[in-house]
């Protein structure tokens, strides 16, 4: 449609739903879309380029492989538990179960054959997962913006490439807080009657980015708790008075704002200087 000269605008279905009257059909949907598109405050979804769609497909495929790998590992542990062989959570502990399956007397032959098939599927998923990880790392090394994003603490090749593939242009947001809100890292509001009430994070928007930012921030907070944060720094002050998970989410929010500033101003990341005691 863009090549034909049309002005294409995408609207999230959740914003169109309130304008649908009674029954759902093509005519009612078209009327609701026209009503929603004419609203001056309507938020439109930016159109992604083919390169962004291709990069996003890499992440969707990787997430699918991770979910399938987790499902198979859970099924394998569950089957072995029924015969008295218990393994903790985590793929690394499945090696013990794999070693047990080499012993014909450990479990019945029928169970052993099924579990060996599951282990073969896990090995195949691991190989494909590794291939996609290599592709993501290659993309991050070839992109100058991704290399600049990776200088931010808690952001590696996967998160940097995901930001470029899944996030809209930084100019879509007026400030860093708007970008953090789009990711779903700002408090959910329950305000009324002039009384402001904030709850947990909204968890709206792009959940893949939110998950990656929280995982990266969790690694930063864990390292700071073990090795100690710089005296007078923001993490050191927060960890002294707040739970670690709360600090992790707050750091993810802070990281999202830094990402927006980096993309908007085309600048390199500069570590903040700790305040003097």
Cite the ranges covered by each PLM segment.
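A detector of single, family-specific signature residues
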Residues: 1-277
């Amino acid at each position: 449609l863009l090549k034909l000269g049309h002005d294409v605008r995408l609207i999230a279905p959740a914003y169109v739903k309130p304008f649908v009257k009674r029954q759902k059909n093509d005519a009612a949907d078209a009327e609701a879309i026209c009503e929603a598109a004419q609203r001056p405050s309507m938020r439109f979804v930016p159109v992604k380029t083919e390169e962004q769609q291709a990069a996003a497909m890499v992440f969707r495929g990787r997430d699918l492989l991770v979910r399938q790998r987790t499902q198979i590992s859970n099924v394998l542990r569950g089957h072995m538990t029924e015969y008295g062989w218990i393994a903790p959570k985590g793929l690394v502990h499945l090696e013990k179960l794999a070693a047990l399956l080499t012993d014909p007397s450990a479990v019945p032959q029928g169970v052993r054959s099924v579990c060996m098939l599951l282990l073969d599927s896990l090995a195949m998923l691991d190989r494909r997962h590794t291939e996609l990880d290599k592709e993501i790392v290659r993309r991050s090394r070839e992109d100058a913006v991704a290399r600049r994003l990776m200088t931010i603490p808690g952001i590696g090749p996967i998160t940097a490439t995901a930001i470029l593939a899944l996030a809209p242009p930084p100019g879509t947001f007026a400030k860093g807080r708007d970008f953090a809100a789009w990711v779903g890292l700002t408090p959910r509001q329950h305000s009324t009657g002039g009384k402001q009430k904030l709850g947990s994070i909204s968890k709206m928007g792009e959940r893949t980015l939110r998950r990656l930012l929280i995982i990266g921030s969790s690694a930063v907070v864990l390292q700071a708790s073990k090795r100690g944060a710089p005296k007078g720094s923001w993490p050191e002050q927060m960890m002294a008075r707040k739970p670690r998970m709360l600090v992790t989410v707050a750091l993810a929010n802070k990281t999202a704002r830094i990402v927006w500033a980096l993309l908007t101003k085309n600048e390199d990341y500069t570590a903040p200087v700790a305040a003097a005691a």
